[in-house]
């Protein structure tokens, strides 16, 4: 029976099953179908793997028929299993650098792929060898390399298998061995049985999936599997990572509220507000995860992070995590003060013209609402702009109803403010509450009636009684804003003035130098310099978009670049507005539900008894006050009005006043 095996020629070595057709023809029927693929190395290996699985062994005598031939150039070695074939190619043909026989060029069949490392060539050899240790846990399909499995797992991202949570006693029939032939994944993809696979743990880095039953043996981890994460993995690691990210945002929000209470930054500065909000936008805040209300803040019930899956050993679910209450928003006074600061920040974002200056572009009509018209038609949060403008304008009324003449461009030197554009600005120092000012105390001076330029320095802004917001603004946006139709933006860094002024100025100069008398007395070079000087000035100082000799392509390019910058600034502006709205809704919801400690009331009650002993400690002084009835009657109404403020000083003053006439 061994003669047919000895007479096989090397040309037929590409079909390992064809060598065994002579002594077991009635048992196997698939080799005639595979023998036609001997010309191509890739198809030969694929057919060999298919034939090895399509003909399941009946007894132990049929095992030697599954030999796999090595198609390396000049090699006719045969291996019984794909694992041994892979080890043979890696050790015999690839070699190692330590043994001085390292070969980084693949010579399998007609392949001549060259790599730079041994790990790369060994990973490439998996393409030729029918070794598929990496199996998909969702469909059961096997792959040769871990990167192929990673790409395949991404195809299951939108599959309902990832979203559907399994029942406790259910099994997925498509995942276990045997498969579901109706879906096209036959048992051919699972041909590595435990008896044939001496290294079953090569491709299972995560062990059995958590919804498997516990009768499967545990498998050790292997770093070659890679970092493949599934949506069904609701284990401790995923829950811990989610908890850590939520806690980082939670701590950042608490620190932000603490900075507001301690006035670490100026709420009237658009640059400071934008920089402070930028740190919150990059984190996953618990407020933004579940709508305007926080997910972990009030802690009405324990929140379980992690768990949810059915592990093989029946482990208990992960413990519930609790986030402590915010230390900076415990009392009612804290909530009220923080809400006032947030309102100032909201007014700064909506009505301050520094949002244009800090971005370096002039955004027409973005921060100015005239009557019932609203020019902020894109990238605006729904139903927030008109109420915000209304509240920002009316909130400054009860404090100090002194209208500040405000120029939307912020350039009274070139564009004088008109009465039609003036409105009460929420960011003006005279309209801010006296309890929340950070700027110098001389706000009520006469200079506070005039708005400041965005290009003003810090010393100028402080001397004028305005916040230092303008120090962060570049000296730009010196142009008109009434281009409401085309919404044109101008880039910063160049001076801009109106077009009629630029055209009218050179014309009388040209007419004055074109006289015949001047031409006779003046050399011909001076008339050439007259029209060249305005061009040089316009090229260096004036925006090229306003000069008549500018190239149209450059003008379009400049306008397009400015438009892109303005759109990005619009997106950032909208994100800041939405974040402020979320924070204000969160504070308002806590105030409405009464979710705050009673420390504020306790402190007020505790202060009144302290005031009493202070008064009783001065009891020696109150005895002479009780004797004259004339001094006691005017003291009671004053003490009844402000009993908490100065109880001791009033007693001393009254005692002194009562003794002085005597």
UniProtKB/Swiss-Prot annotation:
Short sequence motif YPX[LI] motif 2: positions: 646-649
Region spans: Disordered: 1-43, 370-541, 597-662
Disulfide bonds: none
Stretches assigned to coiled coil: none
Gene: pacC
Biased composition (Basic and acidic residues): 498-523, 597-619
PANTHER family attached to this UniProt entry: PH-RESPONSE TRANSCRIPTION FACTOR PACC/RIM101, PH-RESPONSE TRANSCRIPTION FACTOR PACC_RIM101
Top-level taxon: Eukaryota
Ranges of biased composition (kind: Low complexity): 7-43
Origin species: Aspergillus oryzae (strain ATCC 42149 / RIB 40) (Yellow koji mold)
InterPro entries reported for this sequence: pacC/RIM101 (IPR050806), Znf_C2H2_sf (IPR036236), Znf_C2H2_type (IPR013087)
Cited Gene3D superfamilies: Classic Zinc Finger
Subunit structure: Binds to DNA. Interacts with palA, which binds to the two YPX[LI] motifs and is required for proteolytic processing.
Biological process per Gene Ontology, one example term: positive regulation of transcription by RNA polymerase II
Family as reported in the entry's similarity comment: Belongs to the pacC/RIM101 family.
UniProt keyword Ribonucleoprotein present: no
Descriptive protein name: pH-response transcription factor pacC/RIM101
